[in-house]
């Protein structure tokens, strides 16, 4: 069977897009589809435990989201949005920039008194390879001045950075959260393990 992109278009009213996370995390909604019977059930996320059995393997991604969105300034006073994508070495990163026309090779951008960057190269798909110059510890500077890269359909300001992290996040590197995991709580994970489900971690940076 051949598919067209239009086959996957659907209407999603803005008023149905949650602008703040559910509290507690595991009270969000969950859709369960039974492939064998075709049954569709609407549940509360914490009830996912009822669909898991002893010996099942639950794989979670323990990547941690960086506050990867930065705002830089050109020498002419223009503003450029910089999104960290991938660390290439100690000081060089692959980043997305907007607008791109202000970020030609050799261009220097100032982000703060402690942090600046120089554009070293442009990839075939338009990302920039940049080298950062900084005074202090890079990760500490980013944590202080960066903002969480929320999806464009989230319009409200994130009040607590930890709500865009999973409770098992360990390894810095993502530019977006593995969102399916945001709904687990420590208590729910404990109950799942107590039921005999094997919980194993993988590391896959998102973004």
Language model features with spans:
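A cross-family signal for N-terminal binding/gating loops and helix N-caps
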Residues: 1-207
């Amino acid at each position: 069977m051949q598919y067209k992109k239009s086959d996957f278009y659907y209407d999603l009213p803005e008023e149905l897009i949650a602008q703040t996370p559910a509290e507690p995390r595991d009270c969000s909604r969950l859709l369960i589809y039974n492939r064998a019977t075709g049954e569709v059930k609407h549940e509360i996320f914490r009830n996912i435990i009822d669909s898991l059995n002893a010996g099942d393997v639950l794989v979670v991604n323990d990547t941690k989201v960086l506050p990867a969105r930065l705002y830089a300034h050109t020498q002419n006073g223009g503003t450029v949005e910089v999104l960290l994508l991938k660390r290439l070495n100690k000081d060089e990163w692959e980043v997305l920039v907007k607008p791109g026309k202000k970020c030609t090779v050799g261009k220097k951008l100032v982000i703060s008194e402690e942090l600046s960057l120089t554009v070293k190269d442009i990839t075939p798909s338009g990302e920039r390879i940049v080298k950062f110059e900084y005074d202090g510890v890079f990760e500490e500077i980013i944590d202080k001045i960066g903002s969480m890269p929320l999806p464009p359909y989230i319009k409200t300001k994130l009040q607590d950075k930890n709500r865009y992290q999973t409770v098992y996040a360990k390894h810095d590197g993502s530019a977006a959260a593995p969102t399916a995991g945001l709904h687990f709580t420590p208590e729910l994970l404990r109950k799942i393990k107590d039921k005999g489900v094997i919980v194993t971690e993988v590391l896959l940076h998102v973004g």
